[in-house]
């Protein structure tokens, strides 16, 4: 993210779900999923953000 968008930070909005906000079989209940966005919340970046996550091994 730093290399792609120098002034933008990665935001983790949720990693573990205790409140039941995700689908029943979500990996959030096992602590194996995260919800992420960018600090500027620009939805146009989400496709590239997903590609960067895959390249990083997620």
UniProtKB/Swiss-Prot annotation:
GO molecular function: calcium ion binding; patched binding; peptidase activity
PTM section of the record: The C-terminal domain displays an autoproteolysis activity and a cholesterol transferase activity. Both activities result in the cleavage of the full-length protein and covalent attachment of a cholesterol moiety to the C-terminal of the newly generated N-terminal fragment (N-product). This covalent modification appears to play an essential role in restricting the spatial distribution of the protein activity to the cell surface. The N-product is the active species in both local and long-range signaling, whereas the C-product has no signaling activity.
SUPFAM superfamilies on file: Hedgehog/DD-peptidase (SSF55166)
Entry binding sites for Ca(2+) 2: 14, 17, 19
Gene3D superfamilies assigned: 3.30.1380.10
UniProtKB keywords: Autocatalytic cleavage, Calcium, Cell membrane, Developmental protein, Hydrolase, Membrane, Metal-binding, Protease, Secreted, Zinc
Binding-site list for Ca(2+) 1: 13-14
InterPro entries in the record: Hedgehog, Hedgehog_sig/DD-Pept_Zn-bd_sf, Hedgehog_Signaling, Hedgehog_signalling_dom
One Gene Ontology biological process: smoothened signaling pathway
Domain of life: Eukaryota
Residue positions binding Zn(2+): 28, 35
Entry function: Intercellular signal essential for a variety of patterning events during development.
Family that this chain belongs to: Belongs to the hedgehog family.
Domain remark from Swiss-Prot or TrEMBL: The desert hedgehog protein N-product binds calcium and zinc ions; this stabilizes the protein fold and is essential for protein-protein interactions mediated by this domain.
Protein name: Desert hedgehog protein
Classification of source organism: Eukaryota, Metazoa, Chordata, Craniata, Vertebrata
Gene that encodes the chain: dhh
């Amino acid at each position: 993210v730093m290399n792609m968008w120098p002034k933008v930070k990665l935001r983790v909005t949720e990693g573990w779900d205790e409140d039941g906000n995700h689908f029943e079989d979500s990996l959030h209940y096992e602590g194996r999923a995260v919800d992420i966005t960018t600090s500027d919340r620009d939805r146009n970046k989400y496709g590239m953000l997903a590609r960067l996550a895959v390249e990083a091994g997620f």
